[in-house]
Amino acid sequence: MELEERRAALDVRRLPGLTPYAEAWELQRELVRKRRSGEIPDTLLLLEHPPVYTVGRAARDASNLGAGEEYLRSLGAEVFWSDRGGDATFHGPGQLVGYPIIRLKVRDTHRYLRDLEEVVIRALAGYGLEGRRHPRYTGVWVNGSKICAIGVKFSSGWIASHGFALNVNTDLSWFDRITPCGIREYGVTSLERELGREIPLAGVEREIVSGFREVLGDPGS
């Protein structure tokens, strides 16, 4: 039996505390290499970042960073130009970030994005919230505002990395300084805002993992 076959199960890793974006980025690169070679199974990283604005490959310039990188750094946030898909967004405490490092069983990048949306939609349903897709934009929306951003990278061997950022108890004022995902006509929201109370992240993590296994199963098996 090949090593790849022996390692079909999903490995879920919860990183403690706040993980700097650059550190998580380097970890993903290492895990992508190991996943490609079959050294590790499909892996889902769950974590929170300290305040950081990231800009994806869809951005043509820094125009969606509001007053600019220097100003954003003066607020106490990092600015990182990432190799993920998508445009500008914010990550910070109270936001659950998921980075699935998986080999796609179905080699369809658009379907994978819809699957990630479905994972989040099912997690939100566990809290009585109706998550919706938008006909023009990737992500998940609640009551007309974006609650989850999605940006993914696909590497050789059909290995996916990066993933989603779900606003749970996020300080949404950080988004006021940028044009999130380059979308001017809609705002952002969080579970805390929608439900009127702080939501324990551990419960959201359980819903995400459950939804991930329901929707994607063992993606690389």
Curated annotation (Swiss-Prot):
This is Octanoyltransferase. Belongs to the LipB family. Its main location: cytoplasm. One of its GO terms (biological process) is protein modification process. It is found in: Cytoplasm. The lineage of its organism: Bacteria, Bacillati, Actinomycetota, Rubrobacteria, Rubrobacterales. It comes from the Bacteria. GO terms for molecular function: lipoyl(octanoyl) transferase activity. Its EC number is 2.3.1.181. Residues 38-220 form the BPL/LPL catalytic domain. It catalyses: octanoyl-[ACP] + L-lysyl-[protein] = N(6)-octanoyl-L-lysyl-[protein] + holo-[ACP] + H(+). Keywords: Acyltransferase, Cytoplasm, Transferase. It is an enzyme of class 2 (transferase). The active site is at residue 181. The keyword Transferase applies. Pathway: Protein modification; protein lipoylation via endogenous pathway; protein N(6)-(lipoyl)lysine from octanoyl-[acyl-carrier-protein]: step 1/2. Catalyzes the transfer of endogenously produced octanoic acid from octanoyl-acyl-carrier-protein onto the lipoyl domains of lipoate-dependent enzymes. Lipoyl-ACP can also act as a substrate although octanoyl-ACP is likely to be the physiological substrate.
